[in-house]
Amino acid sequence: MKFKIFLAIFAMIFFTSCSSDKENSSNENTDNASLSQSENTDFTLKFLDGRKMYVKYHEQEFNFDDTAKAKLFVFFTSWCEPCKAEIPHLNNLNKKYQDRFEVIALFLEENKEQEILTFIEDEKMKFPVAIGENNFVFSKVLNISSIPTMVLFNAKGEKVKEYLGLIPEEMLDIDIQKAIM
């Protein structure tokens, strides 16, 4: 009986989300730690492939320079096991809806680019990855306090849904279908 209780507690902790302690220590290094959802800010997400995405946040509305697709922003770290477990599902969804939707991963770590590239290769990530201090800015604007956290936006930049912890692929699929309509 004790083993079953232990197993249930362990599973609940594992599948809910990772602690944000490591994230918070990294966030202390940014100049934008005081941002909140009430402030206006503009910033640029920088991707490993050289692409950039301009994000404007004014009066609690988001504007992305790329309005062709709905977006699922995935905030994660390399040490978070639930984050790693989601990657195959996110690859599937990114491929399934590639014409109208994209997954965008945001590393909340200050790793060297080569470490991130190795992680991407090891975990077989097949969607864009943003790196840099503006990932922390975006996480502060969205009030991200744990990982994994995913935030779904439609193509107009309207926030559709926020997810905490490990989310079933089927649930994401249904919400993505609504966001791309």
Task: Give the positions of each predicted feature.
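Hydrophobic beta-strand anchors of alpha/beta hydrolase catalytic cores
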Residues: 72-73, 103, 150
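A short beta-strand-turn-helix
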Residues: 44-71
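Structural microenvironment flanking redox-active thiols in thiol-disulfide oxidoreductases
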Residues: 85-123, 134-139
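Loop/turn elements at helix/coil->beta-strand transitions in domains of secreted/extracellular proteins
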Residues: 68-70, 99-102, 126-128, 155
